[in-house]
Amino acid sequence: MTVFDASALLAFLSAEEGTDIVESALESGGMCSTANWSEVAQKVLAAGGDWDLSRALLLSYGISLEPVDADDAEWAAHRWRAGEGLSLGDRLCLALAHRTDDEVLTADHTWG
């Protein structure tokens, strides 16, 4: 299963380059942490988008929303490094992937 970073879902919703890759992964099933889900909602709303429509579209693919648990939060905290590019949301996405032993799909080029 695929763990979706907020950037991948936002790229899909915005029809950016790589949308076909994200859609294919969505069709195969996947999950998103509730922290990243909040980030997607915030960015859609801040851009003046229709969150209800975006939410319905993403959920129509059967994406699973996974809560952040204490172990995820602590795993993410241990990976914080001053001056490095991974945000809390990024680290919580990686924590979910670590917990579930799944691959992450991101559109964030700073991940390398």
Question: Where are each of the predicted segments found?
Answer:
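Short, polar loop motifs at secondary-structure junctions
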Residues: 15-16, 108-110
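Histidine- and aromatic-rich ligand-binding microenvironments
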Residues: 4-5, 32-35, 86-88, 108-109
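Active-site neighborhoods of divalent-metal-dependent phosphate/nucleic-acid chemistry enzymes
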Residues: 64-109
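A generic structural signal for short hydrophobic patches within well-formed alpha-helices
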Residues: 9-10, 37, 111-112
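Short, well-structured N-terminal submotif of metal-dependent ribonuclease cores
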Residues: 1-32, 44-56
